[in-house]
Swiss-Prot record:
It catalyses: 5,10-methylenetetrahydromethanopterin + glycine + H2O = 5,6,7,8-tetrahydromethanopterin + L-serine. It comes from Methanococcus aeolicus (strain ATCC BAA-1280 / DSM 17508 / OCM 812 / Nankai-3). This is Serine hydroxymethyltransferase. InterPro entries: PyrdxlP-dep_Trfase (IPR015424), PyrdxlP-dep_Trfase_major (IPR015421), PyrdxlP-dep_Trfase_small (IPR015422), Ser_HO-MeTrfase (IPR001085), Ser_HO-MeTrfase-like (IPR049943), SHMT-like_dom (IPR039429). Its main location: cytoplasm.
Length: 429
């Protein structure tokens, strides 16, 4: 491609993305959509600048206004999560995890975390952040029927293995984890409890999940762009006694510049969360439960029917055990994409971790649909679209036509001071 053509190619490709997303039902559990003011804040001069160090104590000059922004992000984060100390400089949830691993453990120390098929994130294991720090990870004992940690076995394992870190949270996360139940055992062996809240920070902010910092976690970390509808980035929340230790491990430890334009957008998203977060989080959970029920009634094997399917934004389908479905999870994910339903295949507890490209499950998330104004009745419509493809074997092109018309009706941002067109392309020239 001629260099002079790249600019137009990128614009045209971005427009295609915007227009495609307008016509899709988006059920990826790790994504969300920001308000127009958040996007405007990201497209500012802050994207060009550096600000190494903490606010009001930078190594660079020219940081007066980013200090104002970052201080506001810190203030809002501490307020929303009732935390004594917040650091918003991690550039992702994985970087936030890595900072805590560096702050609280040394190479060779043991970490207890969720196994990946049970819902743990790759950053909790040797292949990612835990391995970078040289930690030896062992898996929480897991009850697959309950889709949660086995409390009695967990306590016994903490006492026997004496880990340096006990980590909760994950990426397959339908129910709160037993943080309180680990406290006594962790204290006895000198372990620190940390909580990876990347997927559920927005629900925690809205008071609709659990409250890890009050339940015994010394650290809560996560990304700021899943159920928390902010810009891509990370945050670490902890007690005041840990402030210097974690700040030093973030910078100069694992972050240099921290993408200042994203902090400008994050400040607005946090303000939206403070104002609208409770109503939003309540509807996210209602929608997830409704989607699980609607799919279950149509013949899908939705995990944990006996527990109301979920208490978070996530709904988990076991495709292999759905007798009325003849396709694999991998095949279905592709078929749904062809029909403009965007979701992901996912490992389940009985899958081998090496089989991640052909697992038995599908993971759904209700958070982005909720931000676009959908409620329980729309979850029923989505379940019917999915049934028409997965169970009825209806022509995908025909179902797609109906999905496009449905999706176009939900393209306004809700739970914001200024909503606007969710898929508007911000054009500067």
């Amino acid at each position: 491609m001629n260099p002079s053509e790249v600019q137009q190619f990128v614009r045209e490709t971005a427009l295609k993305q915007h227009n495609w997303m307008r016509e899709c039902i988006k059920l990826i559990a790790s994504e969300n959509i920001t308000s127009i003011p958040v996007r405007e804040a990201c497209a500012t001069d802050f994207m060009h600048r550096y600000a190494e160090g903490l606010p009001n104590n930078r190594l660079y000059q020219g940081c007066e206004y980013i200090d104002d922004i970052e201080n506001l992000c810190i203030e809002l984060s501490e307020d929303i999560f009732k935390a004594e100390h917040a650091n918003v400089q991690p550039t992702s949830g994985v970087v936030a995890n890595l900072a805590v691993f560096f702050a609280e453990a040394k190479p060779g120390d043991k970490l207890m975390a969720m196994d990946v098929p049970n819902g743990g994130h790759i950053s909790h294991w040797k292949v990612s952040a835990a391995g970078i720090r040289g930690l030896r990870a062992s898996a929480h004992p897991f009850d697959a029927e309950e889709m949660n940690i086995d409390v009695d076995k967990m306590v016994k394992q903490i006492l026997e293995e004496k880990p340096r870190l006990v980590l909760f949270g994950g990426s397959l996360f339908p129910f709160p984890h037993p943080v309180k139940d680990a406290v006594d055992a962790a204290n006895e062996v000198g372990a620190t409890i940390a909580y990876d809240g990347a997927h559920v920070l927005g629900l925690i902010a809205g008071g609709q999940f659990q409250d890890p910092l009050r339940e015994g976690a010394e650290y809560m970390m996560g990304s700021t762009h899943k159920t928390l509808f902010g810009t891509q980035g990370g945050v670490v929340l902890t007690e005041k006694k840990n402030a210097k230790k974690i700040d030093d491990k973030i910078f100069p430890g694992v972050v240099s510049n921290h993408h200042l334009h994203h902090k400008a957008g994050l400040a607005i998203a946090l303000a939206e969360t403070k104002e609208f977060g409770e109503a939003y989080a309540k509807q996210v959970v209602k929608n997830a439960k409704a989607l699980g029920q609607a799919l279950y009634e149509r013949g899908c094997n939705v995990l944990c029917e006996h527990k109301g399917f979920t208490e978070s934004h996530q709904v988990i389908l076991d495709i292999e055990k759905s007798e009325c479905i003849e396709f694999s999870a991998r095949e279905l994910a592709t078929m749904f994409e062809e029909a403009n339903i965007i979701l992901n295949k996912n490992l389940l507890p009985w899958d081998d971790v090496s089989n991640s490209d052909n697992p038995s499950g599908i993971r759904l998330g209700s958070q982005e649909c909720t931000r676009l104004g959908m409620k329980e009745s729309e979850m029923d419509e989505i379940a019917e679209f999915m049934k028409r493809i997965a169970i009825d074997g209806e022509d995908i092109k025909k179902v797609k036509e109906d999905i496009v018309e449905f999706a176009k009706s939900y393209s306004e941002i809700h739970y914001a001071f200024e909503g606007g067109d969710a898929f508007k392309y911000l054009k500067f020239y």
